[in-house]
């Protein structure tokens, strides 16, 4: 609205940051924070792709953590203000940090609020991670998925 564009992608990143004081007056702080997430996440995705192409999984994990932290802080999509006593996503993310101890990484995934946690867990602690999460959130709360060696591809 502030820039007269239909979508944020049409706004220059530097122009956005320069105009934050005025944008805050027009759109409020939450809109500013969400836009900041979008601008930084757009760059971060490119870095994630590069890290995977270079087979640098440690860098990829750092970027996933940064992305998840940004979702939590700037998108504010981990809990609902309508029921602050229920913050399952935040609890799950905090527990993931405790369980993984830097060996893996987790982040909010999907739409948040009633979304899911995406966790990259080393094979040798998958069972421990799953048990701990299900001890807290209930049976079948944690689903173990595997990524194929070849990733996504078109099937004819």
Describe these PLM feature segments.
Residues 1-107, 119-156:
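C-terminal nucleotide
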Residues 114-117:
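N-terminal pre-core extensions flanking Radical SAM catalytic domains
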